[in-house]
């Protein structure tokens, strides 16, 4: 029997006041097979929410993409205010190896997600440091 390859994903969404928006984003993420949302931390002062979920690595990019797409639909950045600096409706979306997976696999998931977001949503994507391994 093969053990599941599990990664954690921690997208930060630029909405921390409207629970309905965050509930919609989380509902969209949960439509992907094997997703388990572990935590949703809304911050009104920063107007930012950190969602933490785990998922099998083969579904990770799709789950994150669905959340990012829903955030882009629902969050109006032209009206956004908050104490935390932000660049878009989704600021960061790191992947962390949890079990039977590696950082290199997480880097590859990040690259896959970046391509999806750039190509399907026409949203600029910036990839951070470990992306170069």
Where are these regions (language model features)?
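N-terminal glycine-rich anion-binding loops that anchor highly charged ligand groups
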Residues: 2, 25-50
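Short amphipathic alpha-helices in soluble, non-transmembrane regions
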Residues: 25, 64-70, 108-113
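Short, conserved charged micro-motifs
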Residues: 17-21, 58-63, 101-106
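Short glycine-/aliphatic-rich beta-strand segments at the starts of folded cytosolic domains
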Residues: 4-16
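Active-site cofactor/substrate anionic-group-binding motifs, chiefly glycine-
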Residues: 56-84
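Active-site histidine-anchored catalytic micro-motif
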Residues: 81-90, 120
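Conserved small/polar residues in nucleotide/adenosyl-binding loops
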Residues: 131-133
């Amino acid at each position: 029997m093969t053990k599941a390859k599990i990664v954690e994903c921690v997208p930060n969404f630029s909405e921390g006041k409207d629970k309905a928006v965050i509930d919609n984003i989380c509902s969209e993420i949960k439509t992907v097979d094997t997703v388990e949302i572990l935590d949703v931390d809304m911050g009104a002062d920063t107007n930012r929410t950190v969602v933490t979920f785990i998922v099998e690595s083969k579904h990770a990019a799709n789950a994150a993409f669905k959340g990012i797409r829903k955030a882009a639909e629902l969050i109006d950045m032209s009206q956004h205010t908050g104490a935390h600096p932000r660049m878009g409706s989704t600021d960061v979306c790191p992947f962390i190896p949890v079990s039977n997976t590696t950082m290199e696999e997480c880097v590859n998931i990040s690259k896959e997600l970046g391509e999806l977001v750039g190509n399907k949503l026409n949203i600029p994507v910036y990839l951070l440091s470990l992306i170069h391994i």
